[in-house]
Amino acid sequence: MHRSLSRRSVVTSAMAAVAVPALRVAAAATPMLLRCSLETVPSHARNIVIRHYLRTVEAAAGGAIKTQLFESGQLFPDLQVGKALMQGQIEMAVPGSWSLTGIIPDADFFQLPILYGRATDVVHRVVDGWPGQLVARQIEDKLGARVIGRWLDLGSFNWYSTSKPLNSYADLKGLKIRNSGGAGQAWRTQFMGAVPNTTPLPNVALALSQGTFDGLITTNETIASAQFWESGIRHAFEDDQFFGEYVPIVSLDFWRRLSAELQQIFTEVWHDNIENYRASMAAAQSRARSIVQSRGIRLVVPSTEDVAAKREAMLAHQQHLASLSRISPQIVSALSAELDAG
């Protein structure tokens, strides 16, 4: 309990200056219900941020909206929330972009070699710029949904293993590695000589304990919040292979039932607080890194030169990966243009 409270304090302190909209609406006789689905556990930084957002919206709406947050995959794993939104089974979700690639292939552009090992500011330039806007439009069109604002950072994904130490890229060869979804992660796993596996996050702890796979691709925050050291994780190779982003989505059916004032509350609360939310996620990742080390997980960081060399080696296959992942030439061009402009 003490650990969870300590981790939560990192996030809440980073959000201490969050904005609350001045706009409030009169209470409705029967509030509209908003069900939000997350697959991560309650102590995860995403859950803490979204819990704060929902409470702020609910307060500003003056009783017109009642929010319910379903955590730990109680309703759906993130891989299924796109379909759930389309079918009206939930009103809101904040999935990782990788969870949407089965419906929106372009959402997998983070896995392209050109973004491998990139810094946070570079990723923000891309997701806040034209590439991110193009994908957001597709999400809205294909899911029948509304993306309410800029995307929420998760952080850098790395390699983690149970029994085999990870001292270099070569140590990944032959390992069976779980990923969170999308053709790009599977391709990169194979490029490293490992065997890809896709398992929903709520099932990972048991699968690790049973030896279903030898390791996984995830973040320090996810390792810490789920306490995966209890499932056997002992080693990490921090190559910052891609920077995860969550997409805040509200179903279009629910959105259209909102008054203009309520729609404004949804977007303004997110817009006014996204920088603090991103800062809180970064703080959570930093603390999570210390936690996983304190739990005996050995972290190895490849050199900048090794990461750049690996990126260059993968770039030779970028066109093939884009075709395999069904990422459109328009997204690849927009991504290259955004990076060249920087």
Regions found by a protein language model. Give the residues of each.
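N-terminal secretory/targeting leader peptides
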Residues: H2-L5, S9-R24, A28-R125, R137-G342
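Basic, amphipathic alpha-helical recognition segments used for DNA target recognition
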Residues: P131-Q133
